[in-house]
């Protein structure tokens, strides 16, 4: 009973913080410069994790200048974890997110790029959009697995979006992400796989005990002249090694 009550309190606070974020987006963002917006994004992301009982830690440093970040994907919380450290990152996300209440407006404000996965040719469009962002000196983040996993392993990495980095000779920095809690080295509380709904995942996340998320920023890989499939395999091996996962 006590655990459920704590989860309810966390969820109520999360809703309040989400509404606060919406107010910032609607009222403050129009008059803030890019740096000030990024600081708001960092603050909001860290606090939302904290409200849900999740501690954020990072190791290593994000590369300076334009970069494509390649992150393993576990939960809808991954974006907040990365934004807590790299608030300037623009994520490539599935278009389904635009249908999520409240969340859609918030991720829009962070410059999210949307991919219609059902349309085969949309990937090519997004590659061009990402390449343009990288040429403009921006930081873009992608989930090469294309969907979430349980965190116990890594799914195959898709190479399509890496072409944007190769075409612009922009480095790709792998980031190893892991959620853990007091009972598990790989937390089950934040799982968002299969038929799990966003509401169900939100509830189990709020019920978690001592959940933390750790990001390990690994050395960037050069892309000039690279083969995108070989690059995808190398990035997967980098992240697997950092997480202690065997992908042989």
Question: Over which residues does each language-model region extend?
Answer:
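A transmembrane-helix-recognition feature enriched in membrane-embedded lipid enzymes
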Residues: 1-57, 105-110, 208
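Catalytic core of membrane glycerolipid acyltransferases/transacylases, capturing the structured
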Residues: 20-31, 50-51, 64-120
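Soluble, non-transmembrane catalytic domains of enzymes that act on hydrophobic metabolites at membranes
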Residues: 51-61, 77, 112, 156-167, ...
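Residue-level preference for the first positions of well-ordered beta-strands
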Residues: 66-68, 139-143, 171, 214
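A cross-family acyltransferase "interaction/gating" segment
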Residues: 102-105, 152-226, 234
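A membrane-cytosol interface segment of integral membrane proteins
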Residues: 113-134, 237
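Soluble extracytoplasmic domains of inner/organellar membrane proteins
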Residues: 123, 130-162, 166
């Amino acid at each position: 009973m006590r655990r459920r009550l704590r989860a309810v309190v966390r969820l109520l606070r999360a809703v309040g913080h989400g509404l606060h974020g919406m107010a910032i987006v609607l009222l403050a963002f129009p008059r803030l410069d890019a740096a000030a917006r990024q600081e708001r994004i960092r603050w909001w992301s860290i606090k939302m994790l904290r409200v849900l009982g999740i501690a954020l830690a990072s190791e290593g440093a994000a590369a300076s200048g334009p970069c494509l970040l390649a992150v393993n994907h576990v939960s809808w919380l991954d974006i907040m974890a990365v934004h807590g450290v790299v608030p300037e990152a623009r994520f490539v996300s599935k278009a389904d997110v635009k249908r999520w209440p409240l969340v859609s407006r918030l991720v829009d404000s962070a410059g999210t790029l949307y991919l219609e996965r059902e349309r085969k040719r949309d990937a090519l469009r997004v590659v061009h959009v990402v390449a343009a962002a990288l040429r403009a000196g921006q930081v873009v983040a992608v989930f090469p697995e294309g969907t979430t996993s349980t965190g116990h392993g890594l799914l195959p990495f898709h190479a399509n979006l890496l072409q944007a980095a190769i075409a612009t000779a922009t480095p790709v920095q792998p980031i190893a992400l892991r959620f853990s809690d007091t009972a598990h080295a790989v937390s089950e509380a934040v799982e968002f796989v299969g038929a799990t709904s966003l509401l169900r995942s939100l509830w189990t996340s709020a019920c978690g005990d001592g959940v933390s998320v750790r990001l390990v920023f690994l050395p960037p890989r050069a892309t000039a002249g690279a083969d995108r499939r070989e690059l995808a395999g190398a990035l997967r091996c980098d992240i697997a090694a950092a997480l202690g996962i065997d992908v042989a």
